[in-house]
Amino acid sequence: MAGQSDKDVKYYTLEEIQKHKDSKSTWVILHHKVYDLTKFLEEHPGGEEVLREQAGGDATENFEDVGHSTDARELSKTYIIGELHPDDRSKIAKPSDTLITTVESNSSWWTNWVIPAISALAVALMYRLYMAED
């Protein structure tokens, strides 16, 4: 696939890819590229079941979550058979954006200063009482 022009690229529809989701024919989509992993099932270090769960669909998010090595990424290129048709790319669910929440600084002074101060005072008082008994 490397170095090929756009007209040499074989495009597959999402419907066609979804038909290849068993051990006899296992296709997945990674970054809009279509991979035939049928011959790789038994070699996969994470086990064949991991690949079969993703078969026939987009495995990009799961592939990236695992944190595959550079060698694994290079090896994966040997299984590319084409690309997802541009018309079907919008049909793939995009990963949701991470929601980041912040706490207002004026509301956290209580937990940042008062509670630790009271806790330290209580510990000091208990220590003093303990030492006084000896």
From Swiss-Prot:
The lineage of its organism: Eukaryota, Metazoa, Chordata, Craniata, Vertebrata. The modification N-acetylalanine is found at residue 2. It comes from Mus musculus. Pfam families: Cyt-b5 (PF00173). The chain crosses the membrane at residues 109-131. Residues 9-85 form the Cytochrome b5 heme-binding domain. This is Cytochrome b5. Keywords: Acetylation, Electron transport, Endoplasmic reticulum, Heme, Iron, Membrane, Metal-binding, Microsome, Transmembrane, Transmembrane helix, Transport. GO terms for cellular component: cytosol; endoplasmic reticulum; endoplasmic reticulum membrane; membrane; mitochondrion. It comes from the Eukaryota. It is a single-pass membrane protein. The modification N6-acetyllysine is found at residues 7, 10, 19. Cytochrome b5 is a membrane-bound hemoprotein functioning as an electron carrier for several membrane-bound oxygenases. PANTHER family: CYTOCHROME B5 (PTHR19359:SF150). Belongs to the cytochrome b5 family.
